[in-house]
Amino acid sequence: YDNLVLGVTLKADGSTDKKVIASLTEAIKAQSNVEAEWNRLKEIFQNKDLQMISFTITEKGYALKGADGTYFPFIQSDIDNGPEKAGSAMAVVCALLHERFKAGKAPLAVVSMDNCSHNGEKLRNSILTMAEEWNKKGFVEDEFVAYISDEAQVSFPWSMIDKITPRPADTVAESLKEAGVEDMDPVITSKRTYIAPFVNAEGPQYLVIEDRFPNGRPQLEKAGVYMTDRDTVNKVERMKVTTCLNPLHTALAVYGCVLGYDLIADEMKDKELSELE
């Protein structure tokens, strides 16, 4: 699809707005065993003009250890094999930061946009842990660990996003077919992930990011992003997750299951449930 995605905005009255999203310029497989693409990623990270990288990999993507406190086998493999054979997300990022370090130690902002509390802190801890383990085995220098430990050099801004983006809906795919848009069928991967050439999402949205970018940044405000300090990000996240939004959504989900509803949207047509909210 030439890196194009069809954005389908779901509106309260059941209608949709459609827009082609053309902001993706390049798609690269972030795996060290794919030599050409791995070298391309190294080239990108070595560029001193790179200002930020961002993630949406779910909270599980930052986890290094299981409930028993030991490293997952795939993480232990990354630790034992070093940067040139990185496989997991955290190892890949740490390896690429090492490439940036070797190319001149240019600053960079490493931004998690996953919806979990203190996401920047979680990301930083995981990257630092990987670097420290590699340092023990002689794969990376003491100076590299110092480089990514210094937030004046490599920052890990906190963020909070409120954007409901369900998995690709069959009803949306059907409506696109009826409108003459071809090849929109969702695909289910071997890991039960639903992907499609379109993204369906609700219209209401906001993204709040801690303004800590040591190498400068794009004018994210122009895209509607709220730039602020860490304390404000934390307060906004706490408001959403524990006070105003998520608890209400969870309550509706529980009552909806009891009353036989399949969709929150259908629940909102129920007068008593809408008054509960």
Residues covered by each model-derived region:
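Substrate/ligand-engaging "lid" and interaction regions
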Residues: 1-277
